[in-house]
Amino acid sequence: EYIRDKYNFVESEKFIQELAWRDFWRSYAYHHPDQLWKDVEEYKTGFLAQEYADNLPEDIISATTPTQIINVFIEQLTSTGYLHNHARMYLASYIVHFRKVKWQAGAKFFMSHLLDGDIASNNFSWQWIASTFAGKPYIFNLENVHKYCHRSIDILPEKNREIDGSYEEISTRLFPNL
């Protein structure tokens, strides 16, 4: 009630939804603690788990990837310990799908930097992105980033070529085996 009284409906509804997801992930982790670091299901990307790298590439760690917006997200995460929910999903998707790195490596990277890090929310959200705890992989494109982040970040297609394209084009490029 406090949140609903203090904030408008849209703001309070989103916050309450995020709390509900956090509660769901914690409950799931309580009942399935063995799945915090293991794939709940197989990847639904057309690739086997062993085809993904075990470690983050150096350009991700150092925020020097070919994609400007991803570098901005990495720098924000490592310098502030915070990253907006959409930016977390974009960065996770980039790491797993665009760079073919196991979700566990990205989850560890996030947990080492997030001030609000919760292992259950973090890891199962990574699995949802990766498709090991969802029906399909989560992907994004530059248009989606522009829709949710355009006010705070300058987004130029020529500096973000990896993520510039329609969902169909990106999906075909990322998942040629599907």
Q: What residue ranges belong to the model's regions?
A:
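C-terminal catalytic domain of photolyase/cryptochrome flavoproteins
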Residues: 1-85, 93-178
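Beta-strand-enriched accessory nucleic-acid recognition/scaffold domains that flank the catalytic cores
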Residues: 89
